Amino acid sequence: HGGKDPGTVYKDIYEKDINLSISLYLEEYLSEYGATVVLTRDSDNDLSYGETNHRKKTDFDNRIKIINNEYTDMYLSIHLNYLSNKKYYGAQVFYNKDNENLAKSIQEYLNNNLETDREIKEIPSSTYMYKKLEKRGVLIECGFLSNASERSKLITEKYQRKVAKVIAEAVVNYYK
C-alpha cells in the first residue's frame, strides 16, 4: 500500500499511513541492533511508475525485485487487518513456503507483548506476490483497524513504536 493505494480504510484512517509509521520505527529499532534495513517505501508512495492499467501488479513486481535482491536476508511485510466482524483483534503473522518457524517465533513475541492470542496462518500458495518471493520472511498484520479498541491504539505513536519494537526483538531473537 502507499500512494494511490490506501489499503484498508476506516473513516479518515488509512492503513498505508499506519503501516509506514510502524515500518519506519521498525527500521530504527533494527538498525540499533546492527541490521541493515531496506524499505520498499519510506514515504507515501507506491512502486508503480506513471499511470498504468496494471498499477498493482507493477507495484508488486517492483517490491519483489527489492526483496529478492542478493543482499536481502529477510522480508517483513507490514499490514493491518480488517473484517466486518468487529470483535476480532490482535496482531497475526502469515507465512509462505518454508517460513513457519520464523512466523511462530514472531507470533510468540506478539502474543506475549501485545495482549493477543492469535495463531500463525499460511498464505495461500497462489497469492501473487508471496509465491514469487525467494527470501525468508513473513507478512505481519499488526492489528485490526475494524476493532474500535485496537484502532484507538494503532493510531498512536506510542503503540506503533511498541509494535515495531516487539517485531524487532522477535527478529533479533530468531537469529540468536
Predicted regions and their residues:
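Active-site-adjacent substrate-binding region
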Residues: 97-124
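Soluble non-cytosolic domains of exported or imported proteins
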Residues: 13-21, 57-61, 97-101, 154-165
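Active-site histidine-acidic residue metal-binding/catalytic motifs
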Residues: 1-64
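Mature extracellular/periplasmic domains of secretome proteins
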Residues: 57-73, 95-97, 126-133
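A short, glycine/acidic-enriched catalytic loop
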Residues: 5-13, 81-105
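Active-site-adjacent mobile loop/cap segments within catalytic or ligand-binding domains
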Residues: 70, 77, 121-176
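Structural recognition of the beta-strand scaffold that forms the well-ordered cores
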Residues: 36-41, 74-78, 92-95, 119, ...
